[in-house]
Amino acid sequence: ENTSVLGTPDVLGYNSHQYFFTVELKIANGSKVRLSPHQISFHILHPKNAFILVKTKADCRLYSGSQVRELFEKGLSVKPIVRGLRESCLYFENIGK
């Protein structure tokens, strides 16, 4: 958790295609995904190559930063970009390909 700049995602990544991306890491409690106002604001202001990776009891789900409002309001009923940790890693690696 970055306390210097509130809302900054947990992961600042850079792939082999020289594309920068961010990932907010979350653990779902039931069907809800808790996001702070600062985290929501970050993803609204920086929707490109910004992601939210949510760990559920069953799997991991990757959401686009542009889905942040819907994810906050509707929780896990929102359709993710991909499901699974491996699939999420492949998605990050293919940004900009």
Give the residues covered by each predicted segment.
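Beta-rich catalytic cores
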Residues: 7
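A short acidic/basic microdomain associated with nuclease active sites
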Residues: 1-4
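Charged phosphate-binding loop/patch that engages nucleotide di/tri-phosphates or the phosphate backbone
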Residues: 77-97
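Conserved catalytic cores of phosphodiester-cleaving nucleases, focusing on short active-site segments
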Residues: 11-13, 18-29
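Mg2+/Mn2+-dependent nuclease catalytic core
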Residues: 28-47
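Acidic, Ser/Thr-rich peripheral helices and adjacent loops at domain boundaries
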Residues: 70-76
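Helix N-cap / beta->alpha transition motif
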Residues: 36, 63-67, 84
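Nucleic-acid nuclease catalytic cores
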Residues: 45-70
